[in-house]
Amino acid sequence: MPSRLRRIYGLRDFHFITCSCYRRQPLLGTRHAREVFLRIFEQVRRKYKFEVVGYVVMPEHFHILIAEPEKGNPSTVLQVLKQSVAHRLLKPSRKRRSNQPMLWRDDGTGQHRHFWQPRFYDFNVYSNEKRAEKLRYMHENPVNRGLVPSPELWRWSSFRAYFCEEASVVRIDELDAIPKRKPNLK
Protein backbone atom coordinates (compact mmCIF):
# COMPACT_ATOMS: atom_id res chain seq x y z
CA MET A 1 0.00 0.00 0.00
CA PRO A 2 1.39 3.44 -0.87
CA SER A 3 2.53 5.57 2.02
CA ARG A 4 0.35 8.47 3.03
CA LEU A 5 1.47 11.98 2.29
CA ARG A 6 2.41 13.88 5.40
CA ARG A 7 0.18 16.87 5.93
CA ILE A 8 1.67 19.89 7.67
CA TYR A 9 -0.79 22.21 9.36
CA GLY A 10 -0.46 25.03 11.84
CA LEU A 11 2.21 27.04 10.01
CA ARG A 12 -0.37 29.47 8.60
CA ASP A 13 0.77 28.47 5.09
CA PHE A 14 -1.49 28.50 2.10
CA HIS A 15 -2.46 25.08 0.73
CA PHE A 16 -2.65 24.09 -2.92
CA ILE A 17 -5.06 21.16 -2.92
CA THR A 18 -5.96 18.79 -5.73
CA CYS A 19 -8.75 16.25 -5.56
CA SER A 20 -9.88 13.86 -8.29
CA CYS A 21 -13.21 12.29 -9.06
CA TYR A 22 -13.57 8.53 -8.69
CA ARG A 23 -11.38 6.76 -11.26
CA ARG A 24 -10.84 10.17 -12.93
CA GLN A 25 -14.34 10.05 -14.40
CA PRO A 26 -15.73 13.42 -15.57
CA LEU A 27 -18.24 13.68 -12.74
CA LEU A 28 -17.82 17.46 -12.69
CA GLY A 29 -18.18 17.53 -16.46
CA THR A 30 -21.49 19.37 -16.62
CA ARG A 31 -22.26 23.02 -16.00
CA HIS A 32 -24.73 21.96 -13.30
CA ALA A 33 -22.15 19.84 -11.43
CA ARG A 34 -19.53 22.62 -11.49
CA GLU A 35 -22.04 25.21 -10.30
CA VAL A 36 -23.15 22.94 -7.44
CA PHE A 37 -19.49 22.44 -6.51
CA LEU A 38 -18.84 26.20 -6.40
CA ARG A 39 -21.96 26.98 -4.32
CA ILE A 40 -21.00 24.31 -1.79
CA PHE A 41 -17.36 25.47 -1.78
CA GLU A 42 -18.53 28.98 -0.84
CA GLN A 43 -20.76 27.58 1.94
CA VAL A 44 -17.82 25.59 3.33
CA ARG A 45 -15.57 28.68 3.06
CA ARG A 46 -18.02 30.69 5.18
CA LYS A 47 -18.52 27.90 7.73
CA TYR A 48 -14.81 27.18 8.31
CA LYS A 49 -13.65 30.77 7.77
CA PHE A 50 -10.75 30.49 5.34
CA GLU A 51 -9.39 32.69 2.58
CA VAL A 52 -9.58 31.52 -1.02
CA VAL A 53 -6.76 32.67 -3.29
CA GLY A 54 -7.94 30.73 -6.32
CA TYR A 55 -9.67 27.68 -7.73
CA VAL A 56 -10.44 25.80 -10.91
CA VAL A 57 -13.07 23.10 -11.40
CA MET A 58 -12.19 20.69 -14.19
CA PRO A 59 -14.38 17.83 -15.50
CA GLU A 60 -12.62 15.15 -13.40
CA HIS A 61 -10.78 17.08 -10.67
CA PHE A 62 -10.41 20.41 -8.94
CA HIS A 63 -7.63 22.57 -7.56
CA ILE A 64 -8.05 25.08 -4.76
CA LEU A 65 -5.56 27.46 -3.17
CA ILE A 66 -6.67 28.34 0.35
CA ALA A 67 -5.35 29.66 3.63
CA GLU A 68 -5.58 27.49 6.72
CA PRO A 69 -9.10 27.79 8.12
CA GLU A 70 -9.90 29.45 11.43
CA LYS A 71 -12.03 26.41 12.29
CA GLY A 72 -10.63 22.94 11.72
CA ASN A 73 -7.86 22.32 9.19
CA PRO A 74 -7.64 21.76 5.42
CA SER A 75 -8.41 18.03 5.84
CA THR A 76 -11.66 18.90 7.63
CA VAL A 77 -12.54 21.39 4.90
CA LEU A 78 -11.92 18.77 2.19
CA GLN A 79 -13.90 16.11 4.02
CA VAL A 80 -16.94 18.38 4.34
CA LEU A 81 -16.60 19.74 0.79
CA LYS A 82 -16.26 16.30 -0.81
CA GLN A 83 -19.09 14.76 1.24
CA SER A 84 -21.44 17.67 0.56
CA VAL A 85 -20.78 17.75 -3.19
CA ALA A 86 -21.12 13.97 -3.50
CA HIS A 87 -24.34 13.92 -1.48
CA ARG A 88 -25.87 16.72 -3.53
CA LEU A 89 -24.83 15.40 -6.95
CA LEU A 90 -25.49 11.71 -6.27
CA LYS A 91 -28.90 12.23 -4.67
CA PRO A 92 -30.81 12.67 -7.94
CA SER A 93 -29.02 9.74 -9.60
CA ARG A 94 -30.40 6.84 -7.61
CA LYS A 95 -31.08 5.09 -10.91
CA ARG A 96 -28.26 5.17 -13.42
CA ARG A 97 -29.03 6.16 -16.99
CA SER A 98 -27.04 4.42 -19.72
CA ASN A 99 -25.06 7.59 -20.56
CA GLN A 100 -24.21 8.35 -16.91
CA PRO A 101 -20.74 7.42 -15.58
CA MET A 102 -20.61 4.34 -13.38
CA LEU A 103 -20.67 5.42 -9.75
CA TRP A 104 -21.67 2.13 -8.21
CA ARG A 105 -19.72 -0.89 -7.07
CA ASP A 106 -20.81 -3.96 -5.18
CA ASP A 107 -18.39 -4.86 -2.40
CA GLY A 108 -20.37 -7.88 -1.25
CA THR A 109 -22.41 -5.92 1.29
CA GLY A 110 -24.60 -4.11 -1.20
CA GLN A 111 -24.36 -1.17 -3.53
CA HIS A 112 -22.02 1.72 -2.69
CA ARG A 113 -21.68 4.96 -4.58
CA HIS A 114 -18.37 6.70 -5.21
CA PHE A 115 -17.77 10.24 -6.34
CA TRP A 116 -14.22 11.06 -5.19
CA GLN A 117 -10.90 9.29 -4.99
CA PRO A 118 -10.27 8.60 -1.29
CA ARG A 119 -7.28 10.93 -0.84
CA PHE A 120 -6.23 14.38 -1.95
CA TYR A 121 -2.94 16.10 -2.70
CA ASP A 122 -2.00 19.00 -0.39
CA PHE A 123 1.06 21.14 -1.12
CA ASN A 124 2.11 23.77 1.43
CA VAL A 125 2.64 27.07 -0.38
CA TYR A 126 5.44 28.79 1.47
CA SER A 127 6.16 31.92 -0.62
CA ASN A 128 4.45 34.61 -2.69
CA GLU A 129 6.26 33.31 -5.77
CA LYS A 130 4.96 29.78 -5.24
CA ARG A 131 1.45 31.15 -4.61
CA ALA A 132 1.53 33.05 -7.93
CA GLU A 133 2.90 29.94 -9.69
CA LYS A 134 0.07 27.74 -8.39
CA LEU A 135 -2.53 30.37 -9.29
CA ARG A 136 -1.17 30.57 -12.86
CA TYR A 137 -1.17 26.78 -13.08
CA MET A 138 -4.84 26.62 -12.07
CA HIS A 139 -5.90 29.36 -14.47
CA GLU A 140 -4.02 27.78 -17.39
CA ASN A 141 -5.28 24.24 -16.67
CA PRO A 142 -8.41 24.44 -18.90
CA VAL A 143 -6.31 25.87 -21.75
CA ASN A 144 -3.60 23.23 -21.41
CA ARG A 145 -6.26 20.52 -21.46
CA GLY A 146 -7.79 21.95 -24.64
CA LEU A 147 -11.14 22.81 -23.05
CA VAL A 148 -10.92 26.50 -24.03
CA PRO A 149 -8.48 28.59 -26.08
CA SER A 150 -7.91 31.14 -23.30
CA PRO A 151 -8.44 31.08 -19.50
CA GLU A 152 -11.08 33.81 -19.41
CA LEU A 153 -13.41 31.54 -21.39
CA TRP A 154 -13.50 28.90 -18.60
CA ARG A 155 -16.19 30.14 -16.22
CA TRP A 156 -15.35 27.72 -13.42
CA SER A 157 -12.11 29.24 -12.20
CA SER A 158 -11.04 32.30 -10.27
CA PHE A 159 -9.41 33.77 -13.40
CA ARG A 160 -12.45 35.90 -14.30
CA ALA A 161 -12.60 37.36 -10.79
CA TYR A 162 -8.96 38.42 -11.05
CA PHE A 163 -8.73 39.62 -14.63
CA CYS A 164 -12.25 40.32 -15.86
CA GLU A 165 -13.52 41.87 -12.62
CA GLU A 166 -16.44 39.48 -12.69
CA ALA A 167 -18.11 38.46 -9.44
CA SER A 168 -17.42 34.88 -8.42
CA VAL A 169 -19.74 32.54 -6.55
CA VAL A 170 -16.74 31.91 -4.29
CA ARG A 171 -15.29 34.94 -2.53
CA ILE A 172 -11.69 35.51 -3.64
CA ASP A 173 -9.51 37.18 -1.03
CA GLU A 174 -6.34 38.16 -2.90
CA LEU A 175 -7.57 40.09 -5.91
CA ASP A 176 -5.15 43.00 -5.40
CA ALA A 177 -2.09 40.77 -4.98
CA ILE A 178 -1.93 39.65 -8.62
CA PRO A 179 -1.08 42.11 -11.42
CA LYS A 180 -3.86 42.64 -13.93
CA ARG A 181 -3.55 41.59 -17.55
CA LYS A 182 -5.88 42.42 -20.35
CA PRO A 183 -8.24 39.50 -21.00
CA ASN A 184 -8.74 38.10 -24.47
CA LEU A 185 -12.54 37.77 -24.55
CA LYS A 186 -13.47 36.44 -27.96
Description of each model-found segment:
Residues 1-186:
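Short catalytic/metal-binding and nucleic-acid-binding patches
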